[in-house]
A protein has these predicted regions:
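Class I SAM-dependent transferase core
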Residues: 1-65, 69, 98-111
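S-adenosylmethionine
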Residues: 79-81, 91-206
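Class I SAM-dependent methyltransferase "Motif I" SAM/SAH-binding loop
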Residues: 72-76
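Gly/Ala-rich phosphate-binding loop of Rossmann-like dinucleotide-binding domains
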Residues: 83-87
């Protein structure tokens, strides 16, 4: 599993990190018995479907120690995985009480409490600026940019996993937003991509 994580994250991964993520997986499986944290159909492939899929995002951080915000973190995917692999502060935004409590308990249990912050709130109420903004399956791209743009500064990187509708979402978003974009192939799903956006700004209305 070390080799798979290193390929996904494009960086060395220690055995201690693998053990931490293994404990995270066990906590996810246990909690999913009472909460719908991840789809039951994906529990058998949780490493490939969720852990490695999240791990690949750290390769897009602009510099070591970058600050991350994971919007709609839910089960801690990708935020907890990013915190395990990266060195910078990670903020998890989750409005649902039970899931926010799961994130708080999990971060503390994994020894990530000093690195990870949980905000139980809707995205619109969150304040601050972050070096990297990420989210999995929260909203179509254009709407998500509108929801989260207040959290970006001029050099913020947006690292957003997308499925087969990535191109159509991007085309729709470009009606209202300007940005530089790279479409990177997912290392876990041949039908998926990671949209990496920079210099995101709203187009002026005419």
């Amino acid at each position: 599993m070390i080799e798979a994580l290193e390929r996904a994250a494009a960086r060395p991964v220690s055995r201690e990190t693998v053990q931490l993520l293994t404990e995270f997986v066990e906590r996810l499986k246990s909690a999913s018995a009472t909460q719908n944290l991840v789809a039951a159909s994906t529990l058998g492939t949780i490493w490939e479907r969720h852990i490695l899929d999240s791990a690949q995002l750290v390769r897009y951080e602009p510099h070591a120690g970058a600050s991350w915000v994971d919007i709609g973190s839910g089960a801690g995917l990708p935020g907890i995985v990013i915190a395990a692999l990266a060195k910078g502060p990670v903020t998890l935004v989750e409005p649902r009480r039970l899931r926010a409590e799961f994130l708080e308990e999990t971060a503390d249990a994994l020894g990530l409490g000093d690195q990870v912050s949980i905000i139980r709130s809707k995205i619109e109420n969150v304040q601050g600026k972050f070096d990297v903004i990420t989210a999995r399956a929260v909203a179509p791209l254009g709407r998500f940019l509108g929801m989260a743009h207040h959290l970006a500064h001029n050099e913020t990187v947006w690292a957003l996993p997308k499925g087969k509708n990535a191109n159509s979402e991007l085309a729709e978003a470009r009606r209202s937003w300007q940005c530089e974009v790279r479409s990177e192939a997912s290392c876990t799903d041949p039908g998926a991509t990671v949209l990496v956006l920079t210099k995101v700004g709203a187009k002026s209305k005419r």
